């Protein structure tokens, strides 16, 4: 039976990890054992933060809508409730965009929400 030499495989695996760790500080980009841990941890952070990004954007949109609604003498919750009663289905991302870039259109939406609540 032939002897199995694993040098090529190990080198390839190490190179792959060190390539992923490129740009990391100090030993994290140079020493395989440290780089491996850093790459694993980076992957965990990336996985977690891909989910958190969605939550954070929703929070941002709600904060922007709330600020714009309050400029028109209405709270966020009453505004959203009014839109639902007026059967206006615009998601929060678009509402936040309108609130930032088209104040006149947002004011019109607020008026429709107020009318639906009255």
Curated annotation (Swiss-Prot):
One of its GO terms (cellular component) is ribonucleoprotein complex. The keyword Zinc does not apply. GO terms for biological process: ribosomal large subunit assembly; translation. PROSITE patterns: RIBOSOMAL_L20. GO terms for molecular function: rRNA binding; structural constituent of ribosome. Binds directly to 23S ribosomal RNA and is necessary for the in vitro assembly process of the 50S ribosomal subunit. It is not involved in the protein synthesizing functions of that subunit. This is Large ribosomal subunit protein bL20. It comes from Yersinia enterocolitica serotype O:8 / biotype 1B (strain NCTC 13174 / 8081). The gene is rplT.
